[in-house]
UniProtKB/Swiss-Prot annotation:
Domain of life: Archaea
Function: Part of ribonuclease P, a protein complex that generates mature tRNA molecules by cleaving their 5'-ends.
Enzyme Commission number(s) from the entry: 3.1.26.5
Subunit details: Consists of a catalytic RNA component and at least 4-5 protein subunits.
Subcellular location: Cytoplasm
Protein name: Ribonuclease P protein component 2
Organism expressing this protein natively: Methanococcus maripaludis (strain C5 / ATCC BAA-1333)
Gene Ontology biological process terms from the UniProt entry: tRNA 5'-leader removal
Amino acid sequence: MLKTLPPTLREKKRYVALEIIFEEELFQKDVIAIVRNALMNYSGVLGCSRTNPWLIDYNHPYGILRISREEVNNLRSSLSLTNEHRKKPINIHIIGISNSVKHVREKFLHVPHEPYYKVIQKLKKKGPKK
């Protein structure tokens, strides 16, 4: 059985709050494709793998993206150069960067913090999806 790494040896992360201005509603898979293509076009495969982008949450037009701490400037520059998606204009605005999801939601997206156990209780009350 594998042991987990201690916190001092884990990769440091940053969380980025994004606002995507596009004339149509985008889904999570579209946002992932936009971010990966932007990184690939700007810094190539190596830069994309070092940045290690991961979409945490997305509700049109706002999203939270997890990236590597050392590659914040790489992500900023690659997203600022992105101006087209499906031959339509797109603008990606970085609202802010923090080291925790909670701070990104509260400070930049103005979403109040809700403890995780309350979210699970709400999902149990709704029942299974049909």
